[in-house]
């Protein structure tokens, strides 16, 4: 089996464009993926959800992120904030931008933002001290030298879903179905949990 990894936005475009995948995994919104005819609509299977979390430099005080108001206060007091650049296709970055708009603080925080190449890049900025606060998916917070504060509250930032399909162009349909069933199995659920994801929708 060959696994191909990419940004959420990049993978999404590849599936819509008809690139060869047997079991593509995408994130909402994905109606255009279904409309493209490149996936079997009836095969849709929710795998897991992952929240955007907050990290600080190791040993730094951990801010309160228990509510949207607390999150707004954190951003107001922070001198610099790193997160994955949504223009690079980073789904976590899209979620963060949506949160800024939802909280009504997009203009206020703009001058503090440091948009990084992917989640790993955002965490490197935190570890080095270049950014006081960093955000990306909890599953991407593996950089040495950071402390994970925790997930943003759902009322501030909606967790992102991972949804899989069987490709309409799969060379081995039975094999693709078997893989999809495994990816939604209890064994796979344990793997998702180990990476700070919640199985299911």
Residue ranges with predicted function:
Residues 1-19, 26-37, 45-50, 56-201:
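Exported/periplasmic ABC-transporter solute-binding proteins
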Residues 42:
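Short active-site loop at a secondary-structure junction
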């Amino acid at each position: 089996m060959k696994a191909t990894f990419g940004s959420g936005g990049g993978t999404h475009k590849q599936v819509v464009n008809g690139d060869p995948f047997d079991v593509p995994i995408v994130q909402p919104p994905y109606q255009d993926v279904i409309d493209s005819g490149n996936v079997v609509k009836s095969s849709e299977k929710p795998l897991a959800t992952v929240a955007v979390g907050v990290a600080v430099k190791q040993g730094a005080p951990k801010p309160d992120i228990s509510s949207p108001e607390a999150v707004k206060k954190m951003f107001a007091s922070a001198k610099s904030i790193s997160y994955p650049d949504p223009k690079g296709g980073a789904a976590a970055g899209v979620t963060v931008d949506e949160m800024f708009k939802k909280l009504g603080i997009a203009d206020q925080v703009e001058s503090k933002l440091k948009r990084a190449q992917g989640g790993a890049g955002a965490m490197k900025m935190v570890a080095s001290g270049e950014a006081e606060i960093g955000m990306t998916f909890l599953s991407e917070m593996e950089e040495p030298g950071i402390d994970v504060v925790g997930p943003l509250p759902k009322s501030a930032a909606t967790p992102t879903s991972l949804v899989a399909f069987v490709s309409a162009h799969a060379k081995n349909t039975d094999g693709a179905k078997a893989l999809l069933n495994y990816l939604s199995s209890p064994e796979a659920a344990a793997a998702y949990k180990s990476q700070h994801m919640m199985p299911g929708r």
